[in-house]
Regions:
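ATP-dependent adenylation/nucleotidyltransferase module used to activate substrates
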Residues: 1-107, 113-116, 143-151
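Proline- and acidic/polar-enriched loop/turn elements at helix boundaries
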Residues: 55, 160-162, 192
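Residues at alpha-helix boundaries and short interhelical turns
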Residues: 33, 180-184
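Catalytic subdomain that performs nucleotidyl-dependent activation
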Residues: 22, 103-181
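Structural signal for conserved beta-strand scaffold positions within catalytic alpha/beta enzyme cores
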Residues: 26, 52-54, 135, 158, ...
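Conserved small/polar residues in nucleotide/adenosyl-binding loops
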Residues: 185-192
């Protein structure tokens, strides 16, 4: 999703009256086998500066802490590393590639696990980091983003996180698929 957003913002820069200064950063959390060479090459191909911030987040989350909810801690540490680097570079905005499905899954997880309805807003200012977070793809469906990635020939980086595919987010994604299929089935039956 992130490379799709970067590519879309690069295209937008051709037409948008105010030029965007694009800079790509990847937070390498330290999972074995993660290879960001394709990201670097992609950024070079579209002429966007790129850097990789190396961290020991995987060690902290999976060895030192052994948290039962590693995703939450990992996300917080990744964001912290990113915001720190943004501050060092004097960058005050970050664009996350959260899509509509991410928004729905986040709201569903909040409802199930926290007993409240919460999801991220499209724009957030974080005073402690001095950063504004924007989510330009928040209304784009995941399938649309995936099609854009395929059509543009963007190479996807394989996630080597040991809990990938067995997370609360994955559960929320599967639950939404079940709900959608039930609603679709009900809608089809009502039409008959």
């Amino acid at each position: 999703d992130s490379l799709a957003l970067l590519h879309a913002m690069k295209i937008l820069n051709r037409f948008y009256p105010k030029k965007l200064e694009l800079y790509a950063i990847t937070c390498n959390v330290g999972f074995e086998g993660m290879d960001f060479t394709g990201v670097r090459k992609f950024c070079e191909s579209i002429n966007v500066p790129y850097e990789q911030v190396d961290t020991e987040i995987a060690k902290i989350v999976f060895e030192d802490n052994k948290d039962e909810r590693p995703c939450s801690l990992c996300a917080k540490l990744r964001k912290g590393a990113m915001y720190k680097r943004l501050g060092e570079l004097g960058i005050n905005k970050i664009a996350y590639a959260h899509n509509k499905d991410d928004f729905i899954e986040t709201a569903l997880m909040s409802l199930i696990y926290e007993g409240r309805f919460y999801a991220f807003p499209p724009v957030t200012y974080l005073p402690e980091a001095g950063v504004t977070v924007i989510r330009p793809m928040m209304y784009a469906p995941e399938k649309g983003v995936a099609n854009f990635v395929i059509n543009q020939g963007i190479k996807v980086v394989k996630n080597t996180c040991p809990v990938d595919g067995s997370t609360k987010r994955e559960y929320a994604k599967q639950l939404m698929e079940q709900i959608n299929s039930c609603l679709l089935y009900t809608s089809d039956a009502a039409d008959e």
